[in-house]
Amino acid sequence: MVNPKIKTLKNLKALVQNLQQNGQTIVLANGCFDWLHVGHIRYLKAARALGDYLVVAVNGDASVKKLKGISRPLMPVNERTEILAALTCIDYVVVFNELNVEQVLLSLQPQIHCKGTDYTEQTVPEREIVKSYGGRVAIVGDPKDHSTRNLLQRSMKIDKNTSSDSNK
């Protein structure tokens, strides 16, 4: 089933330009979103609150593997995008296969580019790109207390404890 929220960059560019011409504020958030957790939800809701439309750019499988390691992603990109598209705070989802979101930013030129609290406005890698077209960077979400890596470690610990309990 085709989800109308999931767009190609080309289709999304035309849509975003039309929305901006009509005075709408576009916010872009990005990430791997491999095993969605409450930290992601808080980040996305806070990003959505800054504008009229929230676009989420999702790393493709190859870029997740390069960024996070050979055992990742846990879920393929088609599943990650479907889950994200189901969230009411998200208006559109687009996949990018590069290691960073610069090409998406240059193409869409959202007024606001959001990053999580593991960044500061000075450490956002794409900040110069965003400034170059007149956009701004916003740091949103709760403190970086949640991560997929921590969830994986806890899950593995629970699994080991469960296995040893069943051997008694």
Predicted regions and their residues:
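Nucleotidyltransferase catalytic core that binds NTPs
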Residues: 1-168
